[in-house]
Amino acid sequence: MKTLLILTILAMATTIATANMQVDPSGQVQWPQQQPFPQPQQPFCQQPQRTIPQPHQTFHHQPQQTFPQPQQTYPHQPQQQFPQTQQPQQPFPQPQQTFPQQPQLPFPQQPQQPFPQPQQPQQPFPQSQQPQQPFPQPQQQFPQPQQPQQSFPQQQQPAIQSFLQQQMNPCKNFLLQQCNHVSLVSSLVSIILPRSDCQVMQQQCCQQLAQIPQQLQCAAIHSVAHSIIMQQEQQQGVPILRPLFQLAQGLGIIQPQQPAQLEGIRSLVLKTLPTMCNVYVPPDCSTINVPYANIDAGIGGQ
């Protein structure tokens, strides 16, 4: 339609222009004066102004009436449906009421009560510790068979005495020898053993004492003391006990008030040997009545 209107307007304009043109006798075309130009301007203004608004009116009326129609449907339909879907949000708080009611009641009531109940079987565990009491009881029985061992030397005293004397002979020789570890050297002893020999004798003494059974170690130390006493009685006037006194003094052992007496020598030996060899001797070892008091001098001196 627009093209037809434009073509008609152009045709009308050309016809009007050709009608107004004047040809001179010289052959030149003379255009009309400026007065006729407003006349063709009237049809240009009148015709397009009337025809051109018509398509604008059609385009404006047609889309404006059709497009608002879907706009009315979309807001009405989803806006009404979405609030309706919000209604199922109400049943969600309902199961929340069931969860706190069911699990909270059984868990505090059932599991808390059985867990303190299995703590009761913990009481038999200290009861099962009671069988640990018979273990120290058989330990008490072990010293009981030591009693026949004490009676064994009474039955075979000569064999036990000779065995202990032979075993403890290195200890007696070490206690009576003059070594260079002594601070005061006796003028009556001319031979002084070197340090290496003294160390060897001390090691032999401690090894022999460690090999003796523990229940006989006290008796073995008593045998050493008795041998020294017997040797002193044979060699009266000779200061054979000076190395023993000096050794005890070097070990920090308090000497008895009367070391020359038998009990003083015995107590000094009982303190010196365990300290030197690091051997445990029971405290009642000094009060035990050993069968060496009646030993002949010949046996103790050899």
Curated annotation (Swiss-Prot):
Superkingdom as given in the UniProt entry: Eukaryota
Region Disordered, residue ranges: 27-159
Record keywords, A-Z: Repeat, Seed storage protein, Signal, Storage protein
InterPro entries (alphabetical): Bifun_inhib/LTP/seed_sf, Bifunc_inhib/LTP/seed_store, Glia_glutenin
Biased composition (Low complexity): 42-102, 125-159
Single GO term (MF): nutrient reservoir activity
Keyword Repeat annotated: yes
Composition skew (Pro residues), residue ranges: 103-124
Signal peptide coordinates: 1-19
SMART domains in the cross-refs: AAI
Gene3D superfamilies given in the database record: Plant lipid-transfer and hydrophobic proteins
Pfam families, A to Z: Gliadin
Miscellaneous information on this protein: The gamma-gliadins can be divided into 3 homology classes. Sequence divergence between the classes is due to single-base substitutions and to duplications or deletions within or near direct repeats.
Family per record: Belongs to the gliadin/glutenin family.
Functional note: Gliadin is the major seed storage protein in wheat.
Name assigned to this protein: Gamma-gliadin
Organism from which the protein derives: Triticum aestivum
